[in-house]
Amino acid sequence: MRWMILLLILLLPSFAHAGCDDQPSNEVDWTNCNFVENLDLIGVGMANAKMSGVNLSLANLEKSQLNNSDLSIGNFIFANFSNSNLYSSNLQGANCNNANFENANLAKVNFEGANLFTSSFKGANLYEANL
């Protein structure tokens, strides 16, 4: 009987959620994670990521794939999103003070209520973005 229970436990799918120690990847769950160091995330693929409430101040996300990601109420002060793809992502209520979005794909991004003070959008695609 014990071996059957052990077998069932081993065969059941894992329902664990991703944590703050998980490597950046598509669909990563970094909800409310606090990254206090300057993270180097150049060119990472994090499409469909769940990062609501994340702290990525000073992070370098240049050339990253963040399309369809939830970045709402996140902290991105001085973050570098240059040449990144954030197509259809949610940055509602995010703090993007002094963030660099130069040459980024921001089409259909929701910036409603976001702090964009002194952020740079030179050459960015803002087609249907909600500012």
Language model regions located:
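Sec-dependent signal peptide recognition
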Residues: 1-8
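Tandem repeat scaffolds
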Residues: 18-131
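N-terminal signal peptide c-region/cleavage motif recognized by signal peptidases
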Residues: 13-15
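Sterically constrained small-residue positions within well-ordered secondary structures
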Residues: 9-11, 21
